[in-house]
């Protein structure tokens, strides 16, 4: 039976994958997606009604107690449940009705990298399974070569590094790549100790833009498509303010006036460009961490499995 909508529980990088699903399922499947507030299920003990919903838990380890709690409650309420995890033997997988194993292999770094892109791909495959489309299916089949091709822009990342080596930065995206902006900001923060904050371009203009000043570092992440005009508009405005504006783009070209940009045109539909851009964002965060003298695989104060309730 087709669910009325989706509720997705996740934390950290997995939460950004859930944000991606909000746009993907909304556009391709015309489904309403809600991101769960796990504390309603744990600390407050007042879970919302989940009847008619497909409840998805995303956790690379499958051991996040709050994500598990959401799925357990969904099972109690009789909702359809799905676990997306890199450990098919995990507690999360054992609780859910359906399991989508990522098969990404061991992830040795503390920050999520390949499990993040694998989670995005899993969500895209679920979307395709619900509403099949030949063109989207062909694009999915081409992903290995398209993602490999994105590495051709890796050398261009070096020009972006000096702009991001300060103590703070803003990362902007919109639409499908708002989730990518969130993920890149997290990677810069946790691997490089740069206090990076992500915003949707639209939300940024509703107040946060007041923080910018001359030489303020701003990273734009985008793929053209339906939001191209928004990216070009904010880029022009920030350049006029004297900000140091750089970009990661899966598109034929970058907006004019940027200090530097890494550009790769995968020719993928906009819905799938978060996969190529996530890879470039991870490599950028790695280079910034090395430039700042930080081990990006073992950031201080972090654990591979974070247990929150």
Where are these regions (language model features)?
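Active-site phosphate/pyrophosphate-binding segments
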Residues: 1-3, 98-217, 227, 292-309
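Glycine-rich phosphate-binding loops that contact phosphosugars or nucleotide phosphates
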Residues: 2-145, 149, 174, 221-267, ...
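Composition- and surface-driven signal marking solvent-exposed, interaction-prone regions
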Residues: 184, 231-235, 277, 300
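Peripheral docking tails and interdomain loops at the edges
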Residues: 267-309
């Amino acid at each position: 039976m087709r669910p009325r909508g989706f509720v997705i529980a996740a934390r950290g990088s997995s939460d950004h994958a859930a944000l991606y699903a909000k746009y993907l399922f909304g556009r391709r499947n015309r489904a309403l997606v809600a991101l769960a507030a796990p504390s309603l299920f744990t600390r407050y003990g007042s879970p919302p009604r989940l009847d008619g919903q497909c409840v998805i838990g995303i956790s690379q380890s499958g051991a996040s107690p709050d994500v598990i709690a959401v799925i357990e409650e969904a099972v109690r309420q009789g909702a359809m449940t799905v676990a997306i995890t890199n450990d098919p033997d995990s507690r999360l997988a054992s609780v859910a009705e359906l399991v989508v194993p990522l098969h990404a292999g061991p992830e040795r770094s503390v920050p999520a990298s390949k499990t993040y892109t694998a989670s995005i791909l899993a969500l895209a495959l679920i979307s395709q399974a619900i509403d099949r489309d030949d063109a989207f299916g062909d694009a999915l089949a081409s992903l290995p070569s398209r993602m490999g091709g994105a590495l051709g822009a890796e050398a261009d990342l070096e020009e972006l590094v000096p702009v991001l080596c300060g103590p703070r930065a803003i990362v902007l995206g919109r639409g499908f790549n708002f989730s990518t902006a969130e993920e890149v900001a997290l990677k810069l923060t946790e691997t490089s100790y740069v206090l990076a904050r992500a915003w949707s371009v639209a939300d940024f203009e509703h107040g946060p833009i007041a923080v910018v000043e001359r030489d303020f570092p701003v990273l734009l992440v985008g793929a053209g498509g339906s939001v191209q005009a928004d990216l070009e508009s904010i880029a022009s405005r920030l350049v006029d303010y004297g900000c140091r504006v750089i970009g990661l783009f899966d598109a034929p070209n970058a907006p004019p006036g940027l200090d530097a940009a890494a550009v790769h045109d995968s020719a993928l539909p906009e819905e799938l460009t978060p996969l190529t851009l996530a890879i470039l964002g991870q490599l950028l965060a790695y280079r910034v961490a090395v430039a700042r003298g930080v081990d990006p695989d073992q950031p201080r104060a972090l654990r591979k499995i974070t247990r929150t309730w």
